[in-house]
From Swiss-Prot:
Organism phylogeny: Eukaryota, Metazoa, Ecdysozoa, Arthropoda, Hexapoda
WD repeats: 117-156, 159-198, 202-246, 249-287, 329-370, 373-412, 415-454, 457-488
Top-level taxon of origin: Eukaryota
Name of this protein: Protein Notchless
Principal subcellular localisation of the protein: nucleus
């Protein structure tokens, strides 16, 4: 009995010996130290850590941060996250801080308008870089440009002879390109709704995807890359209306194309590969192999920053950029690109009919991670604007969330009752919207890993979804021929 009592006293003193202060260092996710090691109380909260971090970094405006110890996020306080008994008081603990978006995008909760007009299914949707305009492509062979203030069509653009499969805004917002099932590409003037020059013809099959050269590489936005079912990727000068280059190398349909910020073009194909080309001369730089079936789509880590060019659509709402010269705008676009991709090493992720995704870096042939877990075809994949996360949409009715740095699985969002066709991110990287065959849109919260909002309203399958780059609204369209706008 005495021995037992002694033992209890010992454990009591052990508990008392648990450290009440912990030596810690605040380190950025790229490894830079915010300051020297400091003694922190074990009960310190994330709010208090935020104040210390902002003070150490001498931030003029308070930035919200996430904090991690190893893989574990500090949700409430340090002692909740750490196993205090096993903490070595001699050693300094690294607390990694990650800046979050300063602004918050509110979850869209209601349909603000239903815009009929198309006579066939709406196949593609794309907001302009500043979020002020919306373009849609439809099975009725037309492209429509919508005025988002009055929520009516500005222009109905006629010229294609077949289904319009993709629409893409130039990064300066002054041109719109559309590609159709017949293989022709038309450039439109969004101010007038008129064609600019002759259609760009040369492809022998349908156009699957279009990508413009980034603004910081050419503020004139003259060059456009197209991916076609004929197995080729072509580069066009839209001002001259000429094909500058035909990049042949895939042995089956090219499903997607991305124009990176470092002078490289990435293509995915039904030949099961992703290829990387030099934009200047069309030379093949790398072939990324690994998928066992068609590659349906690719996403680039720099997609959001390249889409929005010189300005951040939320932070730069003041429209001060209207007075800037082209050189200043180009400089601003380059700065934004370099902030996301300082060493020009872009990451890309490919999704396939083999139910997997692969994460690649443009400076190595071997994949960083084979991302498995989906039980069916993976149709769409997108990087979050802050490049921390990846979302994928699958025919297995789920959306999955992955860590962008190493492709590790994070969460599964279940709720759709049929195939998920497409996903889009909010500008603050906190929300994902998905569109499905089950006729609904769903908004998911990254923080809670749960459904944030159910958006029923379409009468049939949802093919296209886009979240405005300024976070203000979501647009969706599909088989019921109606475009719906959703807002808070």
């Amino acid at each position: 009995m005495l021995a037992k009592k002694q033992k209890m006293q010992e454990t009591d003193t052990e508990q008392e010996a648990t450290p009440h202060t912990i030596q810690a260092r605040l380190v950025s996710d790229t490894g830079e130290e915010a300051g020297p090691p400091i003694d922190l109380p074990a009960g310190i909260t994330t709010q208090q850590l935020g104040l210390i971090c902002n003070a150490l970094l001498k931030n003029e405006e308070a930035t919200p941060y996430l904090f991690f110890v190893g893989e574990d996020e500090i949700k409430k306080s340090l002692e909740d996250t750490l196993d205090l008994a096993s903490v070595d008081t001699e050693n300094v603990i690294d607390i990694v801080y990650q800046p979050q978006a300063v602004f918050k995008v509110r979850p869209v909760t209601r349909c603000t308008s239903s815009m009929p007009g198309h006579a066939e299914a709406v196949v593609s949707l794309n907001f302009s870089p500043d979020g002020a305009h919306l373009a849609s492509g439809s099975g009725d062979t037309t492209v429509r440009l919508w005025d988002l203030n009055t929520e009516t069509p500005h222009f109905t653009c006629t010229g294609h002879k077949q289904w319009v499969l993709c629409v893409s805004w130039a990064p300066d917002g002054k041109r719109l390109a559309s590609g159709c099932k017949a293989g022709s590409i038309i450039i439109w003037d969004p101010e007038t709704g008129q064609q600019k020059g002759r259609p760009l013809s040369g492809h022998k099959k349908h156009i699957n995807c279009l990508a413009w050269e980034p603004y910081h590489r050419d503020p004139e936005c003259r060059k456009l890359a197209s991916a076609s079912g004929d197995g080729d990727c072509r580069i066009w000068d839209v001002k001259l209306g000429q094909c500058l280059m035909n990049i042949a190398g895939h042995t089956n349909a090219v499903t997607a194309v991305r124009w990176g910020g470092a002078g490289l073009i990435y293509t995915s194909s039904k030949d099961r590969t992703v290829k990387m080309w030099r934009a200047a001369d069309g030379i093949l730089c790398r072939t990324f192999s690994g998928h066992a079936h068609w590659v349906n789509n690719i996403a680039l880590s720099t997609d959001y920053v390249l889409r929005t060019g010189p300005f951040h659509p939320v932070k730069d709402r003041s429209k001060s950029h209207l007075s800037l010269s082209t050189e200043e705008l180009q400089e601003s676009a380059l700065k934004r690109y370099q902030a996301v991709c300082p060493d020009e090493v872009e990451s890309l992720v490919s999704c396939s009919d083999d139910n997997t995704l692969y994460l690649w870096r443009n400076n190595q042939n071997k994949c960083v991670e084979r991302m498995t877990g989906h039980q069916n075809v993976v149709n769409d994949v997108k990087y979050s604007p802050d490049v921390k996360l990846i979302a994928s949409a699958s025919f297995d009715k789920s959306v999955r969330l992955w860590r962008a740095s190493d492709g590790q699985y994070m969460a599964t969002f279940r709720g759709h009752v049929q195939a998920v066709y497409t996903v889009a991110w909010s500008a603050d990287s906190r929300l994902i919207v998905s569109g499905s065959k089950d006729s609904t849109l769903k908004v998911w919260s990254v923080q809670t890993k749960k459904l944030a909002q159910e958006l029923p309203g379409h009468a049939d399958e949802v093919f296209g979804v886009d979240w405005a780059p300024d976070g203000s609204r979501v647009a969706s369209g599909g088989k019921d021929k109606v475009i719906k706008l959703w807002a808070y």
